[in-house]
Amino acid sequence: MKVLFKKLKDGARLPEKATAGSAAYDLYTAEDIIIWQGRQIIPLGFAMEMEDGYEALIDPRSGFSSKGMEGYLVVDYVVETNGYRIEGTIGKFTSMTPSRFDCDVIEGKIDSDYRDGVGVIVCNRDSRAFLIKAGTRIAQMTFHKVETVEWEEVEELSETNREGGFGSTGTK
């Protein structure tokens, strides 16, 4: 399948596989970005076009999921200029040694008819803001065929031995 890639920011990188056997394409940050507490979208600096009948899924990288997201601690500060307070200004970094933060990539979906900029949703549960540098592998993308289904409303469904759902079969 051919996927068209349109750069929206100079720092945008083409998604690429880390190894020949990789199932997913790594996604990179296009510029330095501060990750504040809570949810936010990290723009990747590109748009794409894929064939009809497919979707792209954005997933976390396993290292970030198991160890926390890598970044650089930011110290917030307030700037006062001519009597005005400017809060939330990008702070200075306490260290250029990376740390791990309690921040996760939230799974996302891209439909085949979406043409705007691609972004990664993150949720920072850490109380500290941190910087992710441009070129950081932030998430991964896979492509999947989407089937069109025909729905039919019925009064009854066929019976099975299953019931309960949501963990009802246990863990062992």
Protein language model features and the residues they cover:
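DUTPase catalytic domain/fold
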Residues: M1-K172
